[in-house]
Regions:
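Bacterial Sec-dependent N-terminal signal peptides
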Residues: 1-18
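N-terminal, active-site-proximal structural segment of metallo-dependent hydrolase catalytic domains
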Residues: 13-132
Length: 136
């Protein structure tokens, strides 16, 4: 048996708390969170020749440098952790991530490393080079 409560978190994050019961004689209650978030252009600072990522390079219009990139990783990690309250979200869907490098940095080189998330991601044909990913 599953039931859920949706709520909007900061900005464009949708979180779903799911409750259920195991099919056992004890009827133990299970609760977990599922989050979907458009993190809006999580790009690293390196040019990918197969993608149109010029806007997010250090010498480009956004002046996207390593310190801004690291701050965005830390901010994303902080919000994901805060959404989970005492229990981190079981699943986190992320929109607009550039590549495997940013996901590896987010899950292994930010405060999220403590939560041991793994991930899968798409390789979309989007010309800007943005993909979607799932942390689990």
């Amino acid at each position: 048996i599953l039931s859920g409560v949706s709520f909007l978190a900061p900005s464009n994050i949708i979180a779903q708390e799911v409750h259920g019961r195991q099919a056992s004689s004890q009827q133990e209650r299970i609760s977990f969170r599922v989050v979907s978030w458009n993190i809006e252009n999580l790009f690293d600072t390196h040019h990918d020749s197969l993608k149109n990522d010029h806007e997010y390079l250090p010498d480009a219009i956004r002046h996207w440098n390593y310190s801004r990139y690291k701050k965005k990783l830390a901010d994303v990690a902080r919000v994901i952790t805060a959404i989970g309250e005492w229990n981190p979200p079981a699943l986190v869907g992320l929109c607009e991530v550039e590549n495997d490098t940013v996901l590896r940095d987010l899950t292994r080189r930010s405060p999220l490393k403590e939560l041991s998330y793994r991930y899968v991601m798409t390789n979309s044909p989007d010309l800007r080079g943005i993909d979607v990913a799932l942390l689990y």
